[in-house]
Amino acid sequence: MTKSSFHKLLLGSVLMLLPFTVQAQVVLKNWTIEDHSGKVKILVSSDTLEITAPDGLTLWYNQRLTGDYEIGYRVKMLMQGGKYDRLSDLNCFWGANDPEYPDNLFARSEWRNGIFQRYKTLSLFYVGYGGNHNSTTRFRQYFAKAADTSDAIARPVIKEYTDKAHLLIPNKWYDIKIRVEKESQLTVSTAKSCSDCRLKRMRETDISDSAYWKTTHYLQAFR
């Protein structure tokens, strides 16, 4: 067996053993980067992405997710005295669509470019974990309005927490699960304390009129 074929075999074995979402982390071509600073650094180590972002960054998983699905990942907010270390905004978008380009979420990718206000132009669901300098955790729905639309109209808060139990702890691994079930409910929780960290339960009838169920779903990790 040649060295080249061994590497190909090894890679294939690793990818088969890893969960679907972890496979995507290994292959950067499955991610679309919207980086306001132009200086983001992403290091790949085994099944982990280490991200250093000087300014606004949106990292989209660019494969389509449809039907019922669960998004799961582990994440840590590193606080080690680095220049860009900041304990705030462990955020996630999902169920995202652009009504201006319903068949291509990334048509305005260069325009959005990690600038947070511009994501108001999308329809999606959002969790801002430890937002506002780690003082709030909020679950919102976005309604695809103009970027300068007030938050109350463009992205109203569905549920908010301000207690310490729902805020970020530095250098802690979080097991995040987001489950979407069209026929039953939508939940957002941390795996280790699901009952405490659930943000919202919504029956299908509450959101069936939105573009969420009618078009393609995407996963986004925002930091």
Locations of the language-model features?
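Boundary at the C-terminal end of the N-terminal hydrophobic targeting segment
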Residues: V22-A24
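Carbohydrate-binding surfaces in secreted/extracellular proteins
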Residues: Y73, A165-K200
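Flexible glycan-contacting loops in extracellular carbohydrate-active proteins
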Residues: C197-R223
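Bacterial N-terminal signal peptides that target proteins for export
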Residues: M1-L11
